[in-house]
C-alpha cells in the first residue's frame, strides 16, 4: 500500500486500528485528533506523526484522507481535502480498500456480540495460523490490541451494521450473531429494511460462506428471506434445527463446557468465557475454523486460551465494607445483552445474590426499547439504576432512567457514582456478586470502588 494517508479522528479505537494496519502494509501514515490520548500516544510510539491542530497539517501532501463518524463534513481538514480533489473515505470505506491487500477475509456482524465473536476468532486464528491478522472494535485480551497484522493471508474484521457501513465491505465469509432492533434510525425504523440490508450484505458476490445463529429470530427471518443457492449457508445454535447443534452446556469450576455436533462428529470444548451466548459465539468461530481445514484438536486447545475482549464480563475482586466481593464490568447496553449477562452471572455464581448496577446509554435507546427494559432489568436480585449516559443526546421526556423501570419495585435510583457506592457499601458481602454494566462511563465506577 504505497500511499500517503491522513487519518482524521485517529484517537478513536476504530480509526487508530486502520492507521496501524495501513502503516504495517507499507503506507505513509499521519493522524489528526483534537485531543491526545492513550491511543494517539501508542501511534506516536509506532512512528506515526499525530497532529492536534488543523493548522500544522498540509493536506495537499496526502493521497487519501480517512475520517471517522465523529468528524463533521464541515471540518476544515476534510473540507480542504475535498476542495483539492483528494480521495476522502469514511472509515468503513477505507476498511474495504484495506481488505483488498488480504487473500481471505472473514466479517463478523450482528446487533450483539460481534466484538466478542471477532475477538474469539482472532484469538483462534492467531494461534492456528501465524499469518492471520485482525481489525476489531475492541481490545482483544490475547493480543492486548484491537489490531494485529501478521501477514496478508487471513483477515478477521468486525462489520458494523449500526450505520449500515458493512455494505461497503466484500468479505469471503460472513458470521451473523443475531439481528435485533437497535440503531433503528439507520433503517427508517423498519425491521424489513434492516433485514433487506443484511440480505444485501450476504448476497455480495465475494461472499462464499455464511454462518448464522438459528436460535435468533432475526437470523431465522433472514434464512427465510435469503434464497440464493450459490453460497454455503450453515446454521448453528442450541436448536435441534441447527446444522451444527450445541448441547451438553454446563459449568465446572467457572469453566464453560459444551459439545457440538459437526457433520457426523460429536466434538467437546472448554471455554473461559461465561454464558450460553458466548458458547453460540464460540461455535460460529469453531465451525469457521473447521471449514478452513484446521484440526479439531488444535482448535480445542486454542479455544481454552480465549479470554475475550476488554469490558466484556471483566472480573475483579474488590474489598467493599471489609468484604471481598466479585465485581464484573460489562459493556452490555441493550435489553438482550443485559438479560444474557445476568443469565451468565447466574450460571457461574448460582449461590450468590446478584446486585446489578446499570447505566442506560442514550435516551433514544431508552425510548425505542421502552417496553423491553422492565423485564431485562428485573432479572437481578437487586437493581441500582444510574442516570442515563446521554452520548451527547438531548434529554427526551419519558425516556429517562426512571421511565425504563415503570412497573418494577424494589430498585434503587442512584443520582451518581457516589450514591451508587453508598448503596453497594450497605448491600455487598461475600455472598453477593456485583455486575456493573453500560456503554458509557460507568466502567470508571469499578476503579473508584475500594479506593
Curated annotation (Swiss-Prot):
GO BP terms in the entry: cell division; cell wall organization; peptidoglycan biosynthetic process; regulation of cell shape
MF annotations from Gene Ontology: ATP binding; UDP-N-acetylmuramate-L-alanine ligase activity
Localization per record: Cytoplasm
Family matches, as InterPro entries: Mur-like_cat_sf, Mur_ligase_C, Mur_ligase_C_dom_sf, Mur_ligase_cen, Mur_ligase_N, MurCDEF_pg_biosynth, UDP-N-AcMur_Ala_ligase_MurC
Transmembrane segments: none
Protein EC: 6.3.2.8
Pfam families hit by this protein: Mur_ligase, Mur_ligase_C, Mur_ligase_M
Entry keyword annotation includes Ligase: yes
The entry's keywords: ATP-binding, Cell cycle, Cell division, Cell shape, Cell wall biogenesis/degradation, Cytoplasm, Ligase, Nucleotide-binding, Peptidoglycan synthesis
The keyword Repeat belongs to this UniProt entry's keyword annotation: no
Substrates-to-products reaction catalysed: UDP-N-acetyl-alpha-D-muramate + L-alanine + ATP = UDP-N-acetyl-alpha-D-muramoyl-L-alanine + ADP + phosphate + H(+)
Residues that coordinate or bind ATP: 110-116
Pathway: Cell wall biogenesis; peptidoglycan biosynthesis
Domain of life: Bacteria
Main localization of the protein described in the UniProt heading: cytoplasm
GO cellular component: cytoplasm
Family as reported in the entry's similarity comment: Belongs to the MurCDEF family.
Biological function: Cell wall formation.
Name of the protein: UDP-N-acetylmuramate--L-alanine ligase
Amino acid at each position: 500500500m504505497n500511499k500517503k494517508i491522513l487519518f482524521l479522528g485517529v484517537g478513536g479505537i476504530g480509526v487508530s486500528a486502520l492507521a496501524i494496519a495501513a502503516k504495517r502494509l507499507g503506507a505513509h501514515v499521519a493522524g489528526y485528533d483534537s485531543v491526545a490520548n492513550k491511543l494517539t500516544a501508542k501511534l506516536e510510539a509506532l512512528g506515526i506523526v499525530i497532529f492536534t491542530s488543523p493548522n500544522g497539517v498540509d493536506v495537499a501532501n496526502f493521497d487519501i484522507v480517512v475520517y471517522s463518524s465523529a468528524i463533521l463534513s464541515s471540518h476544515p481538514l476534510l473540507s480542504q481535502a475535498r476542495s483539492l480533489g483528494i480521495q476522502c473515505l469514511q472509515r468503513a470505506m477505507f476498511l474495504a480498500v484495506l481488505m483488498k491487500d488480504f487473500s481471505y477475509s472473514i466479517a463478523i456482524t450482528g446487533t450483539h456480540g460481534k466484538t466478542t465473536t471477532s475477538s474469539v476468532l482472532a484469538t483462534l486464528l492467531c494461534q492456528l495460523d501465524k499469518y492471520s491478522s485482525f481489525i476489531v472494535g475492541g481490545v482483544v485480551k490475547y493480543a492486548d490490541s484491537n489490531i494485529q497484522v501478521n501477514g496478508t493471508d487471513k483477515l478477521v474484521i468486525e462489520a458494523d451494521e449500526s450505520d449500515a457501513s458493512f455494505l461497503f465491505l466484500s468479505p469471503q465469509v460472513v458470521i451473523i450473531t443475531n439481528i435485533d432492533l437497535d440503531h433503528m434510525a439507520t433503517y427508517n425504523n423498519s425491521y424489513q429494511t434492516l433485514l433487506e440490508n443484511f440480505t444485501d450484505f450476504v448476497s455480495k458476490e465475494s461472499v462464499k460462506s455464511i454462518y448464522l445463529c438459528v436460535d435468533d429470530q432475526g437470523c431465522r427471518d433472514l434464512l427465510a428471506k435469503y434464497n440464493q443457492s450459490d453460497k454455503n449457508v450453515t446454521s448453528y445454535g442450541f436448536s435441534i434445527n441447527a446444522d451444527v447443534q450445541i448441547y451438553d452446556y454446563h459449568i465446572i469450576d467457572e469453566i464453560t463446557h459444551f459439545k457440538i455436533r459437526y457433520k457426523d462428529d460429536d466434538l467437546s470444548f472448554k471455554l473461559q468465557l461465561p454464558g450460553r451466548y458466548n458458547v453460540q459465539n464460540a461455535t460460529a468461530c469453531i465451525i469457521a475454523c473447521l471449514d478452513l481445514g484446521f484440526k479439531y484438536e488444535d482448535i480445542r486447545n486454542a479455544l481454552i486460551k480465549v479470554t475475550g475482549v476488554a469490558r466484556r464480563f471483566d472480573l475483579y475482586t474488590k474489598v467493599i465494607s471489609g468484604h471481598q466481593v466479585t465485581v464484573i464490568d460489562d459493556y452490555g447496553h441493550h435489553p438482550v445483552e443485559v438479560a444474557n449477562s445476568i443469565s451468565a452471572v447466574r450460571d457461574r455464581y448460582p449461590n450468590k445474590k446478584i446486585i446489578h448496577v446499570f447505566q442506560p446509554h442514550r435516551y433514544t435507546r431508552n425510548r425505542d426499547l421502552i417496553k423491553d427494559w422492565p423485564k431485562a432489568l428485573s432479572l437481578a436480585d437487586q437493581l441500582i439504576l444510574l442516570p442515563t449516559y446521554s452520548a451527547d443526546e438531548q434529554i427526551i421526556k419519558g425516556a429517562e432512567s426512571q421511565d425504563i423501570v415503570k412497573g418494577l419495585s424494589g430498585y434503587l435510583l442512584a443520582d451518581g457514582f457516589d450514591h451508587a457506592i453508598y448503596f453497594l457499601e450497605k448491600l455487598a458481602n461475600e455472598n453477593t456478586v456485583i455486575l456493573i454494566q453500560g456503554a458509557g462511563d460507568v466502567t470508571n465506577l469499578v476503579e473508584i470502588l475500594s479506593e
